[in-house]
Amino acid sequence: MKKKIVTLGLMMVLSMTAVAGCGQKAGVETTAQAAAESTAADTTAADAAADTTQADAAGTETTAAAQSDDSYQYVSAGDAVAAAKDKSAHVLDVREWDNYVKGRVADSMWCPIFPLEDDSLAEAMGTYAKENLSDGQKIYIICNSGKRGAEKATGVLKEAGIDGSLIYTVEGGAKALESEKGALTTNRADEDIDWKTVAAADALKAVGGSDIQILDVRDNDTYAKGHLKGSIQSSLKEIEDPAAQTAMYKMAKEEMDPSKPVYLLCYSGNKCAKTGISVMKDAGFDVDNLFIIENGAKDKDIQAAFVTE
């Protein structure tokens, strides 16, 4: 009997030990599982954080690209032509003369930025902007294709103090304008300029003096048959001819003084003289200092004063 009791007790002890061992094992497994789940959660959080960071970075890159695209504003060729006509914006052509003279928007302004490597042109444009473009109106820039020239001009205008929100590029530049019917012209006689005149009698009083310049824009043969003493001549008989306008422009730049008044003589005091004034405006002359002799060479007193030397 005693032996059975001892045996039974021993079996109970062994059983309890086994239970305890199983409990410890379960505890270890539970702890390991919890740790694994915690690690997985941490990994998920890290992945989420990484995704968020990547998304933020992508968003920043997208924003930067958008800002880069938005740094230049655009206007259509048709709107630029309309703006020049109704004076709702300054339409500024920045092409070099040889391209500009072959076709320009009527009533546009001209201040070249080409060749782009010529720093003196940027300086001149900065001065021009301060004197002519600082009135708060929008500015529409025309270059060859709506890219490099307009981009450089935009930078120059901003450096000159022009608000960037007022500066627009004509999309496609002169190439787009060529596709717009009637957008480009070589006719300058219909410009919206405040044409000024001088009476024939007053012009004759100034002949031979050093205070004014007399510019005869009649053709070579007509000029040779009779002209005012001391005058200089550049034919604009073919008023829409780019070559004639170029010759006039070069003479104005090289032989004439922009600080002195100019009296222009043409056949009748109309289109040829007006063309000359428009060209001289591009050459840097103040239109308030340019005068058309009334009635031109049709005036009998003017004819009587002609010389042939």
What spans do the regions from the language model cover?
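Bacterial N-terminal signal peptides
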Residues: 9-17
